[in-house]
């Protein structure tokens, strides 16, 4: 059985894609499945490495390997960027630059950015001098890259167990929050990913009869990552975005050594990265979207007490200790002062705005939360709700778009300590529209279908459609060919049962 969809027929000519990763080989973990597709669709692809990977190996070695892998993934050498910061593992005895107000010395001995293997570090290339190893300089360099490229699609690693990954993720979120607030005309598609939990430490199941989807990590079983991020904040597994794999859609075959991701991993010989290929090569690419069309970025904020800015700064949490793998999360919250009876925060939009969807995030910690939050639009209460635990979003979808000038949130009741609101998001539409058009992908049992094999004894296969930017209630038109003539149906929703006749392999698409 074979199945295709229209995702890879999109024309991205003139569009830009930026992949932000901390180390050479993370580009495969973060974007190896989708970056070749974007390049084939005409996009200009960029990869930015924040460190030189110089913890155990010379920067010259790591940079050469990165450039070779990037070329295989469709990124030209002039679009490969190295910020040039030091590679710092957890607990090296060196202060991490995330905590440094004065230049920190990396394990390699460097205290400022540098290049190698024919590549200059970004700061020297753009400003004529390197950047010191400080948090402020790192943030400035990340911001400069994002603002210079102004990519239509940005992929960045998210919070995981490695200090360098954590730093890039948190700094990137802060940079984007500031940029989106200052520039209402820039609204890229931003995708975050877990380079360890859903890639580098993925299930080694490449040789299953049919290619498997990325499996949700189970702490202690599928990954040694001690914090189950996939139950916290915006990491709701069921809300992940899944992209088909370009390699399987276009070649019609599955061969480990021929797969572009495996070939890219092999370039990272110093890391032995290809040893993880069987777990990295899955049938989908999994991301968590940070919607940038949040109306809160253009709103004026007011609070009865406390600083309202953290409720619309792009950050859902911070880091209490960059080195500790299981350290408590740092909070970046709006919280009213003790004795404030009003306990309210308001978002006033420049003009009356159409509102369809709201997502309100509380604190990610376990020590307290808001158990009753009154939500009002232009002075009219539309409901009182408890915020879910662990910073997960309270999601409210209006039955119909509503014209609104102001949204006010009032804490009616809270329990515990250190509770507050981490981020508020207001949207005019259910999905962010932009560079990628909606698509569907046929799946069965949660696995995307490509060149799908069924044993001769199997006579029935239940099919579903994964939808990107398409409502679950929207009807689907589908057509199937069982070898004896096409059969079609219209207006069907949900699962489709496919049976084949003896001796027929069958084929289907939708």
Name each model feature, range by range:
Residues 2-185:
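Active-site beta-strand->loop->alpha-helix modules in alpha/beta enzyme cores, enriched
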Residues 2-4, 11, 92-132, 140-144, ...:
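C-terminal accessory domains and tails appended to enzymatic cores
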Residues 293-324:
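Predominantly extracellular/luminal regions of secreted and cell-surface proteins
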Residues 326-383, 387-434:
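Aromatic, loop-rich ligand-recognition surfaces of beta-strand-rich domains
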Residues 400-403, 495-502:
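Surface-exposed, short loops/turns at beta-strand junctions within beta-sandwich domains
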Residues 436-473:
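Solvent-exposed, low-complexity, repeat-rich "mucin-like" stalks and linkers
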Residues 448-450, 471, 479-498:
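Low-complexity "stalk/linker" and mucin-like segments enriched in Ser/Thr/Pro/Ala/Gly
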Residues 501-510:
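Append "Rare intracellular matches occur via the same short Y/T/C beta-strand/loop motifs
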């Amino acid at each position: 059985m074979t199945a295709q969809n229209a995702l890879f027929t999109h024309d991205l000519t003139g569009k830009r894609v930026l992949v932000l990763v901390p180390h050479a080989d993370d580009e495969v973990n973060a974007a190896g499945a989708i970056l070749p597709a974007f390049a084939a669709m005409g996009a200009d692809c960029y990869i930015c490495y924040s460190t030189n990977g110089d913890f155990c190996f010379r920067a010259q070695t790591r940079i050469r390997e990165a450039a070779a892998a990037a070329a295989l993934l469709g990124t030209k050498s002039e679009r490969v960027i190295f910020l040039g910061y030091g590679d710092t593992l957890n607990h090296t005895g060196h202060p991490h630059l995330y905590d440094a107000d004065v230049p920190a010395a990396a394990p390699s001995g460097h205290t400022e950015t540098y290049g190698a293997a024919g590549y200059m570090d970004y700061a020297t290339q753009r400003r004529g001098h390197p950047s010191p190893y400080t948090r402020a300089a790192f943030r400035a360099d990340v911001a400069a890259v994002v603002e210079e490229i102004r990519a239509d699609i940005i992929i960045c690693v998210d919070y995981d167990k490695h200090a360098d990954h954590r730093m890039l993720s948190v700094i990137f979120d802060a940079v984007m929050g500031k940029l989106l607030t200052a520039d209402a005309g820039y609204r890229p598609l931003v995708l975050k990913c877990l380079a360890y939990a859903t890639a580098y430490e993925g299930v080694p199941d490449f040789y299953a009869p049919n290619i498997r989807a990325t499996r949700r990590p189970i702490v202690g079983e599928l990954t040694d990552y001690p914090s189950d991020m996939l139950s916290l904040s915006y990491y709701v597994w069921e809300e992940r975005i899944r992209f088909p794999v370009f390699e399987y859609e276009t070649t019609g075959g599955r061969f480990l050594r021929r797969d572009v991701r495996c070939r890219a991993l092999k370039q990272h010989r110093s890391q032995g990265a290809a040893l993880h290929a069987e777990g990295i090569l899955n049938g989908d690419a999994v991301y968590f979207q940070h919607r940038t069309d949040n109306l809160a970025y253009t709103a004026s904020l007011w609070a009865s007490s406390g600083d309202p800015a953290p409720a619309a700064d792009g950050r859902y949490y911070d880091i209490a200790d960059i080195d500790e793998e299981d350290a408590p999360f740092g909070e970046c919250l709006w919280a009213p002062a003790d004795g404030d009876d009003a306990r309210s925060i308001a978002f006033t939009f420049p003009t009356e705005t159409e509102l369809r969807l709201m997502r309100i995030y509380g604190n990610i910690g376990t020590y307290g939360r808001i158990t009753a939050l009154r939500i009002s639009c232009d002075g009219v209460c539309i409901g009182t709700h408890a915020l879910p635990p662990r910073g997960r979003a309270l999601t409210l979808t209006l039955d119909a778009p509503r014209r609104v000038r102001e949204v006010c949130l009032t804490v009616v009741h809270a329990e515990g300590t250190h509770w507050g609101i981490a981020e508020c998001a207001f949207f005019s539409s259910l999905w962010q529209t932009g560079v990628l058009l909606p698509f569907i992908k046929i799946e069965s049992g949660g696995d995307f279908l490509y060149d799908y094999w069924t044993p001769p004894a199997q006579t029935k296969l239940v099919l579903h459609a994964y939808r990107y930017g398409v409502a679950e209630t929207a009807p689907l038109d589908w057509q199937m060919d069982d070898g004896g003539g096409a059969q079609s149906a219209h207006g069907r929703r949900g699962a489709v049962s496919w049976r084949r006749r003896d001796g027929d392999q069958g084929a289907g698409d939708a």
